Amino acid sequence: DVYKRQKQIEHELATGNFLIPSTVTVAEFLMDWLPKQCSKHKWAPKTYQSNLALIQNLIIPYIGEMQMQKLRPYHIEALYDTLSKTPCGQYVGGKRRDLSPKQQKRTLSGTTLHEVHQLLHNSFLLAVEWGILIKSPVPVEAPKKTTQERSIWEVEEMRAALDSMEDPILHLAVHLTLVGALREGEVAGLTPEDIDFDAANGMGTFTVNRSMQRVQKDTLAQVDKGCILRIFPDKLEGSKTSLILKDTKTEASCRTIFMTAALREELKQWLERLKREEALDPERYRN
């Protein structure tokens, strides 16, 4: 038996298939892989946060204790099968939650399973490069994404929605969103410097190049802060999250949008109001 094992090792060394035995688990590997990839690719805070959530809530609870070298494709397929029947939010921050009967009926989407597959695919390829695995156990075929058709509001629906809003801040935020197809963080990240009333022959434009986000403080300690323009002071003592202002993700996300006449007028009135408020309380607008 010793002789056979010696010959087997010699053959594996000759063919480049020798693997140093390792007891590293899936959880240990992924929690080592995550910060390294974040640093290498300069992930944005939300990218790090979403990948951490996938690992903590959808991978570690099910296969985290398994040793990497004992993992086989059928284990990954079994994980996908389990996740397809798992309620959304079953685990948060790596801790299991008790869900109501209604909550238990809403299971994870195919898109979420696809994201888990992509993370495992990318990370386990690196495990091969690192010499932990000879071959990735992640199946070639990924879970099918869930396709949902988005409904687009008609002009009448947009007008009705705006007419129903009495709060001027909410009205302006929704108006900007509808005209520019903005995300929530992009609306919050707009400043007076982004607005040009004279552009486009007086039609007016506004430029989207920043986004406001709320992220975990643990995340901020891990990510590259090059894209972060400002971290706002906490309003509540002991808060576990921070409000940040950051650059948009890509050059494509940075865009200039034409105003409608109604939006142009509303923005002018809003900026005039801000100037009046600033004159009455300069300290509020200095921070």
Regions found by a protein language model. Give the residues of each.
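C-terminal flanking helix
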Residues: Q56, H121-F124, V128
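N-terminal DNA-binding module of tyrosine recombinases/phage integrases
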Residues: D1-A78, G93, L274-N287
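Short, conserved phosphate-binding/catalytic loop or strand-edge motifs used
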Residues: Q69-S84, K95-S100, P139-P143
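Short, basic/aromatic-rich helical patch in the C-terminal catalytic core of site-specific tyrosine
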Residues: I76, L120-F124, V187
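Arg/Lys-rich amphipathic alpha helix in sigma70-family domain 2
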Residues: L125-I134, Q269-E272
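Basic, Lys/Arg- and aromatic-enriched nucleic-acid-binding interface segment
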Residues: G89-L119, E129-L190, A200-M203, A252-C254, ...
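Conserved tyrosine-mediated DNA breakage-rejoining catalytic core shared by Y-recombinases
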Residues: A142, E157, L190-R276, P282, ...
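Phosphate-coordinating loops and pocket residues in cytosolic domains that bind phosphorylated ligands
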Residues: M31, K70-P73, K85, I134, ...
